[in-house]
């Protein structure tokens, strides 16, 4: 079936005027290559997630059209998918039922105002825990929807020659000086005491190619961030076959989220994770847990978890569960137009 998707963000802009779509695509390409030349992360996480969503739906045999305002206006009862930043998309006045995500879900008060201007049927978060940031009475609007990981683009690298024991992925976002004292410095000292080689990278300061090369030469990854709604970089490492040692305190650190949370919220840095993937730790038990992790490192199989639960196919199927419910209400069939293999996408 034809699935209209809309995206507005730093990468791709939703332009509602003649020639807007090719202009937006040109702008996206220029931005991508400029950031690549600067050595910065060329695409935002939202845009990577959006591209993966589109690819997963094409794999299921659906036809994707992006930022096609003409189609949406000609078919006002036809459900559409919105991704990226929601507020800019509200200005276009589309009446279609909307499945929102992946993207930056506005705070509850702002979202309530946007619902007066848009037909928001379902709003998604990448995992379950962020839904708890919203008032209890509004939670029926929300659903978890992860974005699939491209396991072909992030292949199993476990058989490559390894020269680095630990890839230390630093995505600390709040109270960095404090976290350097109670988290990062103790980890570095622990690895040094164990005689392990370490490569440290910082979120936002590497390209996908640099990250992939780091994964290829590393035996394991230590993932340090306060909490994630999905955690694409961690899951890309898991897809590449690296066991994960994940810092996971279960505490809400984002001040903006602390202000809006109606009650206790228990976040996670690895919301999609099981015993095949690696181990979690806190600042209080890092040494004990790391020794356990290192001794068991050959017994973890993180790629199996990703292929089973987080592949592009699984991501597309989850989208269609939610999108199909909107189509059922509108009497629109959801059969794919053609079978497609992953190799042809």
Where are these regions (language model features)?
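N-terminal pre-catalytic "stem/leader" segment of glycosyltransferase-like enzymes
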Residues: 1-85, 313, 317-322, 330-338, ...
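Conserved catalytic-core segment of nucleotide-activated headgroup transferases in glycan assembly
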Residues: 40, 136, 147-208
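Catalytic binding pocket for nucleotide-activated donors in carbohydrate/polymer assembly enzymes
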Residues: 230-309
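A short hydrophobic beta-strand element within the catalytic core of glycosyltransferases
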Residues: 221-222
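Extended catalytic core of nucleotide-activated donor transferases of GT-like folds
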Residues: 48-122, 128-130
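Aromatic "clamp/platform" in nucleotide-sugar-dependent glycosyltransferases that forms part
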Residues: 226
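Short alpha-helical donor nucleotide-sugar binding micro-motif in glycosyltransferases
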Residues: 214-218
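Donor nucleotide-sugar binding/catalytic pocket of nucleotide-sugar-dependent glycosyltransferases
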Residues: 121-132, 138-154
């Amino acid at each position: 079936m034809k699935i209209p998707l809309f995206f507005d963000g730093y990468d791709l802009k939703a332009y509602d005027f003649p020639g807007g779509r090719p202009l937006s695509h040109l702008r996206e390409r220029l931005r991508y290559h400029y950031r690549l030349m600067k050595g910065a992360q060329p695409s935002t996480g939202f845009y990577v997630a959006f591209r993966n969503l589109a690819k997963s739906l094409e794999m299921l045999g659906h036809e994707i059209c992006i930022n096609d305002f003409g189609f949406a206006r000609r078919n006002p009862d036809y459900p559409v998918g919105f991704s990226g930043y929601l507020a800019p998309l509200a200005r276009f006045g589309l009446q279609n039922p909307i499945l929102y995500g992946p993207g930056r879900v506005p705070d509850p008060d702002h979202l309530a105002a946007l619902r007066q201007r848009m037909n928001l049927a379902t709003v998604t978060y990448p995992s379950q825990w962020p839904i708890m940031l919203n008032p209890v009475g509004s939670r029926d609007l929300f659903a978890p929807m992860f974005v699939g990981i491209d396991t072909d683009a992030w292949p199993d690298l476990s058989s490559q020659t390894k020269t680095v024991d630990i890839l230390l992925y630093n995505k600390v976002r709040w109270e960095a000086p404090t976290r350097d004292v109670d988290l990062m410095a103790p980890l570095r000292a622990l690895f040094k005491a164990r005689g392990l080689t370490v490569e440290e990278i910082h979120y936002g300061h590497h390209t996908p190619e640099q990250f992939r090369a780091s994964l290829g030469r590393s035996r394991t990854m230590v993932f340090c961030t306060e909490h994630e709604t999905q955690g694409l970089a961690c899951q890309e490492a898991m897809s590449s076959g690296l066991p994960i040692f994940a810092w996971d305190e279960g505490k809400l650190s984002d001040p903006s989220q602390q202000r809006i949370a109606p009650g206790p919220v228990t976040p996670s840095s690895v919301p999609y994770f099981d015993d095949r993937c690696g181990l979690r730790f806190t600042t209080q038990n890092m040494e004990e847990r790391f020794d356990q992790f290192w001794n068991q490192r050959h017994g973890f199989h993180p790629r199996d978890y990703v292929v089973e639960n987080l592949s592009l196919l699984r991501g597309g199927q989850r989208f269609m569960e939610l999108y199909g419910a909107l189509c059922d209400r509108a009497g629109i069939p959801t059969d794919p137009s053609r079978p497609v293999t992953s190799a042809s996408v």
